[in-house]
């Protein structure tokens, strides 16, 4: 009845509707969508955008789900002027297990033997979750040679003075 599309290959309504044509009731995409027709939701942050009529939704990404709840709390309580996320992330299926050609030369290196500085789609995805922070969020990714895991470091400049006690 339900499909969790997590291959990373199908990111548009057109591609995902094939599941619905095969009799599936709902599709949940595990990466940010490539078209605006698909709502992107992080539970506990913006699930109120759903009205129940959606057949296809995106659950953003693991990194977006990691950063969004923290960013939401800080933004609601202090306002965010600038945000920069650095994600340390296990290698992904976009990387090769051995050296070979790739459109991004850094990702051409063997994933299981290389620390790879790269981009992160989470910064862009966060601006979809928090449209008011559109020109505020930046970020980078570092892929590391482990098969699973993710860590996000956020540096924030907030609108009002705060203390460690207030944040905690």
Which residues does each PLM region occupy?
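N-terminal Rossmann-like NAD(P) cofactor-binding subdomain of oxidoreductases
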Residues: 1-108
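Active-site-lining helix/loop region of Rossmann-like oxidoreductase modules
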Residues: 52, 69-168
């Amino acid at each position: 009845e339900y499909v969790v599309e997590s291959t990373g290959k199908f990111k548009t309504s057109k591609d995902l509707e094939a599941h619905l044509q095969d009799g599936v009731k709902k599709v949940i995409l595990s990466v940010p969508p490539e078209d605006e027709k698909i709502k992107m939701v992080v539970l506990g942050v913006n699930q109120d955008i759903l009205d129940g009529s959606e057949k296809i939704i995106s659950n953003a990404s693991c990194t977006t789900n990691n950063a969004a709840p923290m960013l939401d709390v800080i933004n609601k309580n202090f306002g965010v002027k600038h945000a920069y996320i650095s994600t340390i992330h296990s290698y992904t299926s976009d990387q090769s297990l051995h050296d070979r050609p790739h459109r991004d030369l850094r990702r051409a290196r063997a994933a299981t033997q290389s620390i790879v500085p790269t981009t992160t789609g989470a910064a862009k995805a966060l601006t979809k979750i928090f449209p008011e922070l559109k020109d505020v969020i930046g970020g980078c990714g570092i892929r590391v040679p482990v098969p699973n895991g993710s860590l996000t470091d956020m540096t924030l400049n907030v609108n009002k003075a705060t203390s460690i006690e207030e944040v905690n």
